[in-house]
Amino acid sequence: MIILGIETSHDDTSIAIIEKGKILKMITWSQSDFFAQYGGTIPELSSRQHSQNIIRIIDKLKSEFDFSKIDAIAYTEKPGLIGTLQIGFLVAQALSRVLKIKAYPIDHIEGHFFSASFEKNYLFPALALIVSGGHSQLMLAKDKDNIEVIGSTLDDAIGEVFDKVATKLNLGFPGGPKIEALCKDNDFDLVKLTKPKTQGEFDFSFSGMKSQVINLANQKKHSSKNLACSFQKEAVDYLLEKTKKCLEKYKINSLILGGGVAANFLLREGFKKLHENVYIPSKELATDNAAMIAKVLYEKLK
């Protein structure tokens, strides 16, 4: 089965073609450089960028692949920016009519869940930590069709906080990669931050940590590097600690990391030490992409 995937939930325009769960083609155009001048994504402008990019990507893929061989279309339905999601939906429906094949709506978070499964299939039950600019969740899967959210952020998502901390410290956008690059040499003085406590055992809260960094930055007692690197370390430790708590309660056969923040080196290295069977996507597949959307449909139909 050959599936075409479409991903337009935020600021990445991506189209992929997979066959039997393997990636044949994928083109992803990021809007990060465009929005760096604004310090963040502007939904209306993002929709315009998607409208321009998605047609160009389709034209390029059509020159490389025979679209008449495609059996089904998978497009991101939710969650995401309403305007950008609409672009993907309209293109999926148009292709569906032209190619006379069905277009299936896919949940973006499920895409991140399956993003690390291209090399080898998961062994269930599985636990997943999905962390991105819009989401921070712990998910327990009895099998590929029964996935339950057992913990989520009560306020900000971790990727969003990386962006806000970086903006406050004048480090640029997107915040995650900027902070990671700054702290790569590991040469900084740790500024202790208080980790939040939540009523839900596996829930997250990042607004307090964000506020601490902003307040300390206003006091001008610490360098931007010390604050940024301390935030990264404390935030990653917090994510790992929550994941460890889940592992103590649930017996699982696979531990999965997904979402844009999964590209963070510190998180990836710490995650590898938590379980004997860890699945981590490549950096290309950690960020928003259409291959993971197509993979969800493949798992549902196979």
From Swiss-Prot:
Where does this polypeptide localize? Cytoplasm
Cofactor note from UniProt?
Binds 1 Fe(2+) ion per subunit.
Which cofactors does this gene product need? Answer: Fe(2+)
Is ATP-binding tagged as a keyword? Answer: no
Molecular function (Gene Ontology), one example: iron ion binding
Q: Which reaction does it catalyse?
A: L-threonylcarbamoyladenylate + adenosine(37) in tRNA = N(6)-L-threonylcarbamoyladenosine(37) in tRNA + AMP + H(+)
Q: Name one GO cellular component term.
A: cytoplasm
**Chain's role:** Required for the formation of a threonylcarbamoyl group on adenosine at position 37 (t(6)A37) in tRNAs that read codons beginning with adenine. Is involved in the transfer of the threonylcarbamoyl moiety of threonylcarbamoyl-AMP (TC-AMP) to the N6 group of A37, together with TsaE and TsaB. TsaD likely plays a direct catalytic role in this reaction.
Entry protein name? tRNA N6-adenosine threonylcarbamoyltransferase
What species does this protein belong to? Answer: Mycoplasmopsis pulmonis (strain UAB CTIP) (Mycoplasma pulmonis)
Q: What is the lineage of its organism?
A: Bacteria, Bacillati, Mycoplasmatota, Mycoplasmoidales, Metamycoplasmataceae
